[in-house]
Regions:
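Short, conserved catalytic-motif segment at the N-terminal edge
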Residues: 84-112, 127, 131
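Extracytoplasmic
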Residues: 85-88, 107-109, 113-117, 143, ...
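N-terminal secretory signal peptides that target proteins for export/translocation
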Residues: 1-23
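Structured C-terminal helix/loop/strand segments within mature extracytoplasmic catalytic/sensor domains
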Residues: 16, 45-76, 82-84, 185, ...
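Active-site SXXK
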Residues: 113-135, 148, 315
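Active-site-adjacent helix/loop patches that line small-molecule binding or acyl-intermediate pockets
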Residues: 56-76, 140-221, 234-237
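Short, well-structured active-site flanking segments
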Residues: 128-145, 157, 253-257
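Bacterial N-terminal signal peptides
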Residues: 29-41
Length: 344
């Protein structure tokens, strides 16, 4: 099990020796050990540590925005007789003042299965690794990223997960082999933790076909049988924070964030299925960068919305169950009206 209190994973023992030398006054030995310890830190750990420096402020709950969101949700739930309040998970971050972001949420801290929304996280991790020099965004990788985000290909997603984890989940593994497999597949989660995001589990492929034995083993967290306790999960608040970092060019660097947002741009004129999602509720002249997710029991969207006047907000709406109505679109439309009124 990883030591959650280590500054760099796998280095606690090394730095303890350095600290002991410091306490006993053996400065020369301590400096030598410090150099050795730093040189032997995994490259990935340096990237994680550096990534956590200078992140944008976390959003604080705004009573005013919360009251507005509660009214909007209540109004739209009344219009949907086939949608229960417990099925709705929602978060809004207002970025009007980037240094004082405001948060409101509705069941937004409850974890749900994110379906294809998780793909935006895998995209972010690939760009992070590219920035660290671990992999290269080749034309083939770029094509797979496009297929994963735009048409939301599960096949492309599986390829991307295998790329960053250097694994293949076809066959079941021995306990020793499984431990290494699990470590590799949880690399994306370690990156998220370095960003301060703890309420996302991003380690599984997205499936639209039979699941191989090795992947089932991982879904069961290594057990030979039983429930899938290791599924991908996400809260609306955590998804919104992830998108806030993307919107503020803090997820990786500006060039990478620009490329990611470009992949996520939505246009209802060319993507008719977006009419019931966030983009469907925004006026002409707005820009929406989002990732949807749909299965037999999920209907999600998570996006960055930039209004014609330049005001930006994050909106994540996860709906569980078989509902397929206009709730997401209508909430998006009402939030647009609210923010425009606030500016007048």
């Amino acid at each position: 099990m990883e030591n959650k209190h280590e500054l760099f994973p796998g280095t606690a023992g090394k730095f303890n020796y350095v600290y002991a030398c410091y306490l006993t006054g053996h400065w020369i030995i301590g400096i030598a050990l410090l150099i050795f310890a730093m040189l032997s830190v995994p490259f990935e750990a340096y990237g994680a540590f550096a990534q956590n420096i200078g992140l944008p402020p976390e959003p604080k709950v705004s009573e005013q925005l919360q009251r507005a969101l509660d009214r909007i949700v209540a109004k739209n739930l009344k219009k949907q007789s086939n949608l229960a309040s417990s099925q709705v998970h929602l978060a809004v971050i207002d970025l009007t003042n980037p240094q004082q972001p405001r948060l409101a949420q509705y069941n937004g801290r409850e974890p749900v299965y994110p379906s294809s929304v998780i793909k935006m996280v895998y995209m972010g991790y690939v760009y992070h690794l590219a920035k660290q020099g671990v992999l290269e965004i080749t034309p083939k990788v770029r094509k797979k990223l496009y297929q994963m985000i735009h048409p939301s290909s599960n096949t492309a997603t599986a390829w991307i997960v295998d790329l960053w984890s250097q694994t293949s989940g076809v066959e079941q593994r021995s306990p020793r082999e499984y431990k290494e497999f699990s470590r590799r597949r949880n690399a994306c989660n370690r990156w998220l933790r370095s960003l301060g995001i703890t309420q996302i589990n991003a380690c599984q492929k997205t499936w639209g076909s039979p699941i191989p034995p090795g992947e089932k083993q991982f879904l069961r967290n290594g057990k030979p049988s039983g429930p899938w306790v290791n599924r991908n999960t996400m809260t609306a608040v955590a998804a919104a924070r992830f998108l806030q970092l993307l919107a503020q060019n803090a997820l990786v660097d500006k060039k990478s964030c620009d490329a990611m947002r470009k992949l996520m741009v939505r246009d209802v004129r060319n993507q008719s299925y977006q009419r019931m999602r966030i983009a469907g509720g925004t006026p002409k002249g707005s820009k929406v960068c989002s990732k949807t997710g749909t299965t037999s029991d999920t209907f999600h969207d998570a996006g960055i919305v930039t209004l014609p006047n330049g005001r930006t907000f994050i909106l994540t709406i996860f709906i569980t169950g078989s509902y397929r109505g206009p709730f997401i679109r209508n909430v998006s439309k009402d939030l647009y009206a609210y923010f425009m009124k606030q500016m007048s």
